Amino acid sequence: MRCPYCGGSETQVKDSRPSEDGAAIRRRRVCPDCAGRFTTFERVQLREVVVLKRSGKRVPFDRDKLQRSIDVALRKRAVDPERIERLVSGITRQLESAGEPEVTSEAIGELVMAGLKGLDDVAYVRFASVYKNFREARDFEELLGTLSDGMPVPAAAPEAEGDPEPEASGRRRAGRP
């Protein structure tokens, strides 16, 4: 395996163990040329899956692209990396074992949305807004309505006239009745 730091062609495996979900082998490698250390993952590929894009173009399925799109949706969210890896591995395994040589990009998007919905609501909304090409605030409102089991999201209740604002600490500030 080529070193990602110096490009050296010979690297040595220092440690090898199965990943937590058992779907991959994690290998720690070191480059004898530059002493750089890096991690690789070895996975079984059941079959070549071809993605049929909306434009009609056919491209090979790219697990790394799937990982990146999920990472973007989960950016700055407190989700355990192992859970993210399980989601990506599960979607990949599902696509490879489906028996279909081609899968639409829409089908992959639906699998990602279903996985993110169970993982993190904010990431689900982020991904859906790009995947479904939201154009208006109403698009978000409709999606948020589905998060609460199809029940519409309640609007904030208007304040009654003459009611004082609630105090955060329970104390009134000086000079107020």
UniProtKB/Swiss-Prot annotation:
Cofactor: Zn(2+)
Gene giving rise to this polypeptide: nrdR
Region annotated Disordered, chain positions: 148-177
GO biological process, one term: negative regulation of DNA-templated transcription
Keywords, alphabetical: ATP-binding, DNA-binding, Metal-binding, Nucleotide-binding, Repressor, Transcription, Transcription regulation, Zinc, Zinc-finger
Organism: Methylobacterium radiotolerans (strain ATCC 27329 / DSM 1819 / JCM 2831 / NBRC 15690 / NCIMB 10815 / 0-1)
Keyword Nucleotide-binding among UniProt keywords: yes
Gene Ontology MF, one: zinc ion binding
Domain ATP-cone as annotated: residue spans: 49-139
NCBIfam families per UniProt: transcriptional regulator NrdR
unnamed zinc finger segments: 3-34
Note describing how the cofactor binds: Binds 1 zinc ion.
Listed name of the protein: Transcriptional repressor NrdR
Family: Belongs to the NrdR family.
Function field: Negatively regulates transcription of bacterial ribonucleotide reductase nrd genes and operons by binding to NrdR-boxes.
